[in-house]
């Protein structure tokens, strides 16, 4: 019987189903890089026909003569059976080939140290190759061999070596699977802008709103100063719906800085969770005193606009006068689907009062949440500057609060007058 054929790939590359690249009298590239023992075991392949065209010039002379002398169709070609030769002549030549291969690889360990099942054998591993076919590998590709000794103590068995190498490869090249979560941290699609840019956009929106409020306030007619002064609505038409629109703009702008006063945020707060108070920090950098005064300026202009509207209504009721048809103010229509509310004066007055009360209540809650930025470094802000800024803002808040209370009282009085006159 011929000696068992030694597989071309080392045990480590064979167990991982990788191509074994080696040259001369040294270990393969992967074993040298991992500082592992590079050993060869006998092949357990049996009766698997190899259909590879090997050049005759690359095969030893004895094998080439055997291939040319074989004329029997039942006789297999050289390389078809590497572990179980079919004739005595083949035994002699394969032994010569085995001896020549063994002499050229003195660093190969004895066969059988790492037994591998035949099911893990690849068909390309037993193809006959010579040293001329193997690529030459430079020492820089495996510095462990050039600079230091190779590990000589092999693991206990081939399965342990396979597990160690598999763990090493998994750590170097992690792969995300269905059961293994991805190692990469998720990246948010939404990129938060810098706080400075956010605050600058808020101040710009407040400034534009302040200009629009100033222009809109100029279109609302002033109420009569006394009962003796006649009242007329001619050439004094203005849009009440724009007043509501500007009020909503102020609510939305300030809500971006203080979202805890959104109605949706209140609805989403779970039961049993204490609601955040005005002392909690806003969703961005706090507004400075100048920005807080800008918010109060917008709110003051809205209060003045509403006060003019309701003062004109109160003047009409106090005089018990009947407005001519051509002097009617164009009120916005209210429509729900195909249903439209009638355009009666009483109904329009009720809608205006209710919408104004609701918007003013929401704006009042938001204004109470606006707090200036408090300096954390006492060295940067002197005591006089801090006292002056705090006094200015406190006075502005008190003034705006007084104007708000006066407007709410006017709305309540107007509603009571409409009820007494049986208009509502």
UniProtKB/Swiss-Prot annotation:
Gene3D superfamilies: Zn(2)-C6 fungal-type DNA-binding domain. One of its GO terms (cellular component) is nucleus. The keyword Cell wall biogenesis/degradation does not apply. InterPro entries: Carb_Metab_Trans_Reg (IPR050797), Zn2-C6_fun-type_DNA-bd_sf (IPR036864), Zn2Cys6_DnaBD (IPR001138). GO terms for molecular function: DNA binding; DNA-binding transcription factor activity, RNA polymerase II-specific; zinc ion binding. Residues 265-286 are annotated as: Disordered. The keyword Flavoprotein does not apply. Keywords: DNA-binding, Metal-binding, Nucleus, Transcription, Transcription regulation, Zinc. It is found in: Nucleus. CDD domains: GAL4 (cd00067). Residues 10-38 bind DNA. PROSITE patterns: ZN2_CY6_FUNGAL_1 (PS00463), ZN2_CY6_FUNGAL_2 (PS50048). One of its GO terms (biological process) is positive regulation of metabolic process. PANTHER family: GLUCOSE TRANSPORT TRANSCRIPTION REGULATOR RGT1-RELATED-RELATED. Transcription factor that regulates the expression of the gene cluster that mediates the biosynthesis of isoflavipucine. This is Isoflavipucine cluster transcription factor ATEG_00326. It comes from Aspergillus terreus (strain NIH 2624 / FGSC A1156). The lineage of its organism: Eukaryota, Fungi, Dikarya, Ascomycota, Pezizomycotina.
């Amino acid at each position: 019987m011929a000696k068992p054929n030694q597989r071309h790939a080392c045990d480590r590359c064979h167990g991982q189903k990788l191509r074994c690249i080696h040259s001369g009298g040294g270990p393969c590239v992967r074993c040298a890089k991992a500082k592992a023992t590079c050993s060869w075991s006998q092949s357990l392949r049996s009766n698997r026909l190899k259909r590879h065209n090997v050049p005759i010039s690359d095969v030893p002379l004895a094998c080439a003569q055997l291939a040319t002398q074989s004329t029997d169709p039942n006789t297999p070609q050289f390389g078809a059976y590497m572990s179980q030769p079919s004739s005595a002549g083949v035994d002699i030549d394969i032994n010569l080939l085995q001896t020549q291969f063994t002499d050229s690889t003195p660093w190969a360990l004895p066969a059988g140290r790492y037994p591998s099942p035949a099911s893990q054998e690849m068909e390309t591993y037993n193809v006959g190759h010579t040293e001329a076919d193997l690529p030459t590998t430079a020492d820089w590709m495996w510095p462990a061999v050039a600079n230091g000794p190779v590990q000589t103590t092999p693991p206990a068995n081939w399965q342990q070596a396979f597990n160690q190498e598999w763990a090493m490869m998994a750590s170097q090249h992690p792969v995300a699977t269905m059961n293994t979560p991805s190692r990469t941290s998720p990246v948010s699609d939404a990129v938060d802008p810098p706080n400075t840019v956010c605050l600058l956009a808020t101040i710009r929106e407040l400034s534009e709103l302040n200009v629009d409020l100033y222009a809109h306030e100029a279109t609302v007619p002033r109420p009569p100063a006394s009962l003796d002064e006649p009242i007329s609505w001619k050439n004094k038409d203005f849009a009440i719906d724009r007043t509501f629109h500007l009020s909503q703009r102020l609510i939305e702008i300030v809500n971006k800085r203080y979202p805890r006063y959104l109605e949706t945020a209140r609805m989403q707060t779970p039961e049993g969770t204490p609601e955040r108070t005005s002392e909690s920090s806003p969703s961005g950098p706090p507004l400075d005193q100048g920005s807080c005064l800008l918010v109060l300026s917008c709110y003051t202009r809205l209060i003045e606009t509403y006060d003019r509207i309701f003062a004109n209504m109160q003047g009409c009721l106090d005089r018990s006068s009947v407005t001519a048809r051509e002097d009617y103010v164009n009120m916005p229509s209210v429509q729900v689907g195909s249903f439209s509310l009638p355009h009666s004066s009483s109904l329009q007055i009720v809608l205006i009062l209710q919408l104004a009360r609701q918007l003013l209540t929401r704006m009042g809650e938001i204004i109470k949440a606006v707090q200036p930025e408090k300096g954390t470094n006492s060295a940067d802000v002197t005591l006089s500057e801090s006292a002056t800024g705090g006094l200015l803002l406190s006075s502005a808040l008190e003034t705006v609060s007084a104007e708000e209370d006066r407007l709410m009282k006017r709305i309540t009085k107007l509603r009571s007058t409409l009820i007494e006159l049986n208009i509502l």
